[in-house]
């Protein structure tokens, strides 16, 4: 996170009025990933679909990151609880380090206009629960580097329900360091 981010950016729950802007951010993110060696993670299926984003908003699990001026520059899914992510129940090549209730971030994306948006969103989510899990595609080196920079540890591999595609699983916990 950059100095002054707290004054510059804030997180709030997404509203239906934000949908068009959220969709624009995902278009940018898919293009960014394709240009940075990760064309498969969201590109072929135009992930995430609009109906899933609408569902996330309706269920109160979609968030946006706004600048101090109210411009939406990032978005993500966040939920927390005990055993809340079914695909995280089975992990190969390793193990989760903390079995306590956790938060999950999915579908994190920014429009690229504000440096540090992804870090700000992840720091906010971690601050809500002190134990966060996230997964990413093996080709998503940008996200892998960000997670490592923020103190997340790679724990193994999980498989996404929709297509049984492998994802690198990361975790950060107040209870387990290093």
Q: What do the predicted segments below correspond to?
A:
Residues 10-24:
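A short beta-loop-alpha structural element at the N-terminal edge
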Residues 31-51:
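Conserved GNAT-fold acetyl-CoA-binding loop/helix
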Residues 64, 71-81:
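Conserved beta-strand in the GNAT
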Residues 77-113:
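Conserved acyl-donor/pantetheine-binding loop and adjacent beta-alpha core of acyl/acetyltransferases
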Residues 113-127, 145-149:
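Conserved acetyl-CoA-binding loop-helix of GNAT-fold acetyltransferases
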Residues 139-156:
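Conserved active-site alpha-helix within GNAT-family acetyltransferase domains
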């Amino acid at each position: 996170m950059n100095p002054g981010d707290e004054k510059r950016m804030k997180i709030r729950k997404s509203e239906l009025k934000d949908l068009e802007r959220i969709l624009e951010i995902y278009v940018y993110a898919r293009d960014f990933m394709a240009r940075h060696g990760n064309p498969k993670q969201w590109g072929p299926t135009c992930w995430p679909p609009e109906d899933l984003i609408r569902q996330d908003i309706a269920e109160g699990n979609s968030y946006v990151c706004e600048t101090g001026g109210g411009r939406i520059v990032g978005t993500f899914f966040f939920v927390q609880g005990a055993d809340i992510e079914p695909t995280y129940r089975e992990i190969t090549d390793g193990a989760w380090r903390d079995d306590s209730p956790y938060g999950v971030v999915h579908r994190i994306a920014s429009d690229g206009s504000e440096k540090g948006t992804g870090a700000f969103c992840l720091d906010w989510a971690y601050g809500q629960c002190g134990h966060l899990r996230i997964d990413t595609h093996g080709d998503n080196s940008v996200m892998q580097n960000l997670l490592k920079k923020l103190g997340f540890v790679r724990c193994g591999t999980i498989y996404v329900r929709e297509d049984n595609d492998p994802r690198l699983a990361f975790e950060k916990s107040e209870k387990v360091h290093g």
